[in-house]
Amino acid sequence: MYNVKKSIKLGIAPIGWRNDDIPEIGKENTYKQILSDAALTGFSGTEVGGCYPQDPAELNKELMLRGLEIPGQWFSSFIIRDGIASAMNAFEQHCAYLQAIHAYVAVVSEQTYSIQGIIDKCVYTEKPNFSDSEWQLLCEGLNALGKIANAHGLKLAFHHHMGTGVQTLPEVDRLMENTDPQFVHLLFDTGHIYVSDGDVMPLLSKHFDRIKHVHFKDVRNEKLKACRLAKKSFLNSFLDGVFTVPGDGNIDFKSVLAYLVGHQYSGWIVVEAEQDPKKYNPLEYAQKGKKHIDELLKNYL
């Protein structure tokens, strides 16, 4: 029988404390502080951030001291730009590290032509588009990377993302249709698909069978509208407060969670809200997000 408490683990991404795209943001927050805040708030783990140690033994000790786990870590693939062989070599090392820290998923985003880290490119109008041959290469490459992930006891979860070539529902459709479900799974990110398409449920319902990892990111509609009008970049949009933790924005997480539980989702739900930690206290917002999810989960416990 499906048991929500045993099937779903709650985690948080370090991106509320530190940001890998803008390293000076939140640099006063050490990885140990992030782990301690996550444990204090009652999360089961965090994803790996850029400030985390690359020595598995060091990280494993700090995790053990706090009773935490690592669900996964982001990997920027450049399959289209650099070719499959190059991506495989880098991903092999990535997966070896994730295996050593007992992770569950390798989160992959194809970053060829990505504008997510370009400060003066409007993320709402200037996203890249792949050609047919580039799509074919990408899907072949992801299948190859997925085999590597499986060999390390991991699942490759592809992250649809604003400012990339796989952002919209039709693009996710194409990726799912042309990759092998044995090797390529999907990360469902509420915030990215909401900003991109204006709705979260179509992607969730259409591709639930491929979803092996979930990010709960909320969106402030008034901030989003202002950033669209001002043609802001992805980085400036999050610095302006477009994203926040569940319950602090406008996404209907009650419906999202009802669907996940109703279809017996098993895996991690990771709160991910890239914000400026000077404006939005990371611990305070971690607690706010956790409280909202806990309230919603009460209906199923």
From Swiss-Prot:
<dbReference type="InterPro" id="IPR036237">
    <property type="entry name" value="Xyl_isomerase-like_sf"/>
</dbReference>
<comment type="similarity">
    <text>Belongs to the IolE/MocC family.</text>
</comment>
<dbReference type="GO" id="GO:0030145">
    <property type="term" value="F:manganese ion binding"/>
</dbReference>
<keyword id="KW-0464">Manganese</keyword>
<dbReference type="InterPro" id="IPR050312">
    <property type="entry name" value="IolE/XylAMocC-like"/>
</dbReference>
<protein>
    <recommendedName>
        <fullName>Inosose dehydratase</fullName>
        <ecNumber>4.2.1.44</ecNumber>
    </recommendedName>
</protein>
<keyword id="KW-0170">Cobalt</keyword>
<dbReference type="GO" id="GO:0019310">
    <property type="term" value="P:inositol catabolic process"/>
</dbReference>
<dbReference type="InterPro" id="IPR023952">
    <property type="entry name" value="IolE"/>
</dbReference>
<keyword id="KW-0456">Lyase</keyword>
<dbReference type="InterPro" id="IPR030823">
    <property type="entry name" value="IolE/MocC"/>
</dbReference>
<dbReference type="GO" id="GO:0050114">
    <property type="term" value="F:myo-inosose-2 dehydratase activity"/>
</dbReference>
<dbReference type="Pfam" id="PF01261">
    <property type="entry name" value="AP_endonuc_2"/>
</dbReference>
<dbReference type="InterPro" id="IPR013022">
    <property type="entry name" value="Xyl_isomerase-like_TIM-brl"/>
</dbReference>
